[in-house]
Amino acid sequence: MPTIQQLVRKGRHSKVVKTKAPALKGNPMKRGVCTRVFTTTPKKPNSALRKVARVKLNGGVEVTAYIPGEGHNLQEHSIVLVRGGRVKDLPGVRYKIVRGALDTQGVKGRQQARSRYGAKKEKK
């Protein structure tokens, strides 16, 4: 244990918490413009073609964001809303695009977890 004199000299340092989504700069979401929409393959042992987009955010930072859900209407110059949240099997992808906001359409025919994918309730 330190002496009182040592604490007077140095003091206690609180741990610095590193943010998991630095490009958002503390905001819950940020708007951006798609610069490139493409597919990429996940790490082993998974196998797929994951849909991702390079997005230039309003702060000037360019990030890679995942496009969740089945099918999308995004292309270059689409305006999107980006939130934090990494994709475990895609290295370097720490953001997700919000479905059903701005230029991004919701997932068609989605029955469960509709609010996450911007899907409207289907009429019977």
UniProtKB/Swiss-Prot annotation:
Per the record, the GO terms for biological process are: translation
Write out the ranges of the annotated region (Disordered): 105-124
Example GO molecular function term? rRNA binding
Q: Which residues carry this modification: 3-methylthioaspartic acid?
A: 89
InterPro entries named in the record: NA-bd_OB-fold, Ribosomal_uS12, Ribosomal_uS12_bac
Name one cellular component (GO) term: small ribosomal subunit
| Database matches in PROSITE patterns | RIBOSOMAL_S12
Per its UniProt record, what Pfam families does this chain match?
A: Ribosom_S12_S23 (PF00164)
Positions with biased composition (Basic residues): 111-124
Q: Which domain of life is it from?
A: Bacteria
* Keyword field: Methylation, Ribonucleoprotein, Ribosomal protein, RNA-binding, rRNA-binding, tRNA-binding
SUPFAM superfamilies noted in UniProt: Nucleic acid-binding proteins
Can you tell me which family this protein belongs to? Belongs to the universal ribosomal protein uS12 family.
Q: How does it assemble?
A: Part of the 30S ribosomal subunit. Contacts proteins S8 and S17. May interact with IF1 in the 30S initiation complex.
Protein task: With S4 and S5 plays an important role in translational accuracy. Interacts with and stabilizes bases of the 16S rRNA that are involved in tRNA selection in the A site and with the mRNA backbone. Located at the interface of the 30S and 50S subunits, it traverses the body of the 30S subunit contacting proteins on the other side and probably holding the rRNA structure together. The combined cluster of proteins S8, S12 and S17 appears to hold together the shoulder and platform of the 30S subunit.
The record's section on NCBIfam families has: rpsL_bact
Q: What name has this protein been given in UniProt?
A: Small ribosomal subunit protein uS12
